[in-house]
């Protein structure tokens, strides 16, 4: 026989609500600390015992509550933060539903002590399992103290899902860290089992980061500040080498509220995509400010997820703000001490270690032509000759480079200011910056220059192409042929010129000019693979970036490549004029720095 529909008792509905709001001790801490911040406090003390299962106590010096308000606060959906439905779209507080206190009280032994500013005494309320047992006057400082004991004592099924004391305590510490980063003007203290985990005094955001994440992280952060299209993005972003294996150090806030939002995270990762290797995540503390009516925070019980009215605009502004800082590579510092002249500046021939004069001349001849000749026609599956080293379009020599010596000196960029010592293994350029030794990966540097050049050309309409003297036929799969037909426009903008020869056979008539002299058919197939992934989880912009990265990588020297003085100067001039110049498009570093102290330590001189 079917059961009749009935109204659930209030004690049961509170437990159901608690299941949505109170997932673990950290959830309780979040709700109570947010209430303290909404109360306008200047200091918050968070104390836990047994990972929060035995005790959670939150003390603040905020505005406090009267006896009547304190009792009303334990009723469901009782709040001072909203009054009409319009208020839901103009929220200026962290809490607004009026569910937290009754939900927490329903699954714990709960004590609320509060004293309103200007009152001569406070009020203390004790509740057990959601039922108020005692209300009395008390003496206390202005503010509020909430104590939660024996969490989930009346819901044993929930206790089974609790993790170890250490794990639950770690979640609480992480939660308090996120909240403390959002309000550097508020003092925070976090105590676990009588031990102070951290104490953060009021100060600047950088001070707060140093106190919570460490001075090493703080020293690697650089400011972000951009306001456009109704969105303002401020905060701090770390240089690429200070990265993590997980997204745990992405601290993002919308109108002061900590969020984990896929749109925001994607925008940040897009800005870093050519700085970090796959599987690495940056350290950022970002604050996004938009009109309250442009964001809906009433999406999830924990309020960690939000919905933007114009998410595309928000995404692009965040990405642009982070890229603006990364583009300037502010972490490159010039030594303040004068650059000492190298002991012996090698002549151009001396950069080539173990290479005879005849080989030097051959290399110079190869470098005379800025664009290599296109490889002669060969069938796709014909026997291949022994592989030759990949060649880059040579950097112009000292007599014909794009930026002459005057321009290099006039630019005054970081790379051009370095004193070149020589080459190591025909792959790394050794330089001196004051007393520091700077080692530059010439392949990574040239790859970044080529990549940024390709991006500029693509943004202007089309990557510079080059027609083949002997067009080449290529057999593609049916799927690859479909991709060519569907994305012919994108392929054309990327510098490829393909003509349908019938069936799945295509004629390659032109290629990106930077690919001349390389295995461009292999790259063509890789490009088609990238374009095949569109529509599932990738946009055309994502695919194009990856394709241009591949083109840049294939177009530059991979093996040992001796450089003359003029070529090094030209490369450095290009690097000074190139955005994001400290990392190659794959995220690998272009340069490493060793201080004199580090070198002396290697030799046990200090």
From Swiss-Prot:
Role played: This protein is involved in the repair of mismatches in DNA. It is required for dam-dependent methyl-directed DNA mismatch repair. May act as a 'molecular matchmaker', a protein that promotes the formation of a stable complex between two or more DNA-binding proteins in an ATP-dependent manner without itself being part of a final effector complex.
Organism of this sequence: Geobacter sulfurreducens (strain ATCC 51573 / DSM 12127 / PCA)
The protein's name in its UniProt record: DNA mismatch repair protein MutL
Entry-linked InterPro entries: DNA_mismatch_repair_CS, DNA_mismatch_repair_MutL, DNA_mismatch_S5_2-like, HATPase_C_sf, MutL/Mlh/PMS, MutL/Mlh/Pms-like, MutL_C, MutL_C_dimsub
Protein family membership: Belongs to the DNA mismatch repair MutL/HexB family.
GO cellular component: mismatch repair complex
Any Gene Ontology biological process: mismatch repair
PROSITE patterns for this protein: DNA_MISMATCH_REPAIR_1 (PS00058)
Gene that this sequence comes from: mutL
Molecular function GO labels: ATP binding; ATP hydrolysis activity; ATP-dependent DNA damage sensor activity; mismatched DNA binding
A Pfam family this chain is assigned to: DNA_mis_repair
The keyword DNA repair is annotated on this UniProt entry: yes
Keywords of the record: DNA damage, DNA repair
Gene3D superfamilies reported for this sequence: 3.30.230.10, Histidine kinase-like ATPase, C-terminal domain, MutL, C-terminal domain, dimerisation subdomain, MutL, C-terminal domain, regulatory subdomain
Location of the region described as Disordered in the Swiss-Prot/TrEMBL record: 377-401
């Amino acid at each position: 026989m079917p059961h009749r529909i009935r109204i659930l008792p209030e004690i049961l509905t509170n437990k159901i609500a608690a299941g949505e709001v109170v997932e673990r001790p950290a959830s309780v801490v979040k709700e109570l600390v947010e209430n303290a911040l909404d109360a306008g406090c200047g200091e918050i003390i968070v104390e836990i015992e047994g990972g929060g299962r035995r005790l959670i106590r939150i003390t603040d010096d905020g505005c406090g509550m009267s006896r009547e308000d304190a009792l009303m606060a334990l009723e469901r959906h009782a709040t001072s933060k909203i009054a009409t439905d319009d208020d839901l779209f103009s929220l200026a507080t962290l809490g607004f539903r009026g569910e937290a206190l009754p939900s927490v009280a329903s699954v714990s032994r709960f004590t609320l002590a509060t004293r309103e500013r200007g009152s001569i005494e406070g009020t203390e309320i004790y509740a057990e399992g959601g039922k108020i047992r005692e209300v009395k006057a008390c003496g206390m400082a202005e503010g509020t103290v909430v104590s939660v004991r024996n969490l989930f004592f009346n819901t044993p099924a929930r206790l089974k899902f609790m993790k170890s004391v250490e794990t639950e305590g770690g979640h609480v510490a992480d939660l308090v860290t996120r909240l403390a980063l959002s309000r550097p003007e508020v003092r925070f203290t976090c105590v676990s089992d009588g031990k102070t985990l951290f104490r953060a005094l009021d100060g600047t955001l950088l001070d707060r980061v140093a106190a919570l994440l460490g001075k090493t992280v703080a020293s690697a952060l650089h400011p972000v500040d951009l306001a456009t299209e109704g969105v303002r993005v401020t905060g701090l972003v770390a240089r690429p080498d200070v990265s993590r294996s997980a997204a745990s150090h992405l601290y993002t806030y919308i109108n002061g509220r900590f969020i984990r939002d896929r749109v925001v995270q994607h925008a940040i990762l897009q800005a870093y995509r050519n700085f970090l290797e796959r599987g690495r995540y940056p350290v950022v503390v970002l604050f996004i400010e938009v009109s309250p009516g442009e964001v809906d925070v009433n999406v999830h019980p924990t309020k960690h997820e939000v919905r933007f009215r114009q998410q595309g605009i928000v995404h692009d502004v965040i990405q642009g703000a982070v890229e603006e800082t990364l583009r300037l590579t502010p972490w490159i510092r010039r030594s303040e001490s004068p650059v000492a002249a190298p002991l012996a500046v090698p002549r151009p021939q001396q950069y080539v270690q173990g290479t005879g004069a005849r080989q030097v001349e051959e290399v110079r001849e190869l470098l005379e032509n800025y664009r290599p000749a296109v490889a002669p026609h060969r069938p796709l599956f014909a026997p291949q000759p022994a592989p030759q080293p990949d060649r880059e379009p040579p950097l112009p020599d000292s007599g014909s480079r794009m930026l002459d010596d005057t321009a290099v000196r006039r630019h005054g960029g970081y790379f051009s200011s370095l004193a070149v010592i020589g080459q190591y293994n025909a792959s790394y350029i050794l330089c001196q910056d004051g007393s520091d030794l700077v080692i530059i990966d010439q392949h990574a540097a040239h790859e970044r220059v080529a990549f940024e050049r390709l991006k500029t050309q693509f943004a202007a309409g089309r990557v510079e192409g080059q027609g083949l003297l002997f067009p080449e036929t290529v057999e593609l799969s049916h799927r690859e042929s479909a991709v060519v037909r569907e994305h012919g426009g994108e392929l054309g903008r990327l510098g490829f010129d393909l003509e349908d020869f019938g069936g799945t056979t295509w004629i390659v008539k032109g290629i990106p000019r930077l690919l001349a002299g390389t295995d461009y058919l292999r790259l063509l197939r890789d490009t088609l693979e990238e374009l095949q992934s569109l529509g599932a989880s990738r946009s055309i912009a994502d695919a194009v970036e990856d394709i241009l990265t591949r083109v840049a990588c294939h177009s530059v020297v991979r093996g040992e490549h001796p450089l003359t003085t003029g070529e090094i100067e030209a490369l450095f001039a290009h690097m000074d004029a190139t955005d994001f110049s400290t990392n190659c498009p794959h995220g690998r570093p272009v340069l490493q720095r060793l201080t004199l102290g580090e070198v002396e330590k290697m030799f046990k001189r200090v």
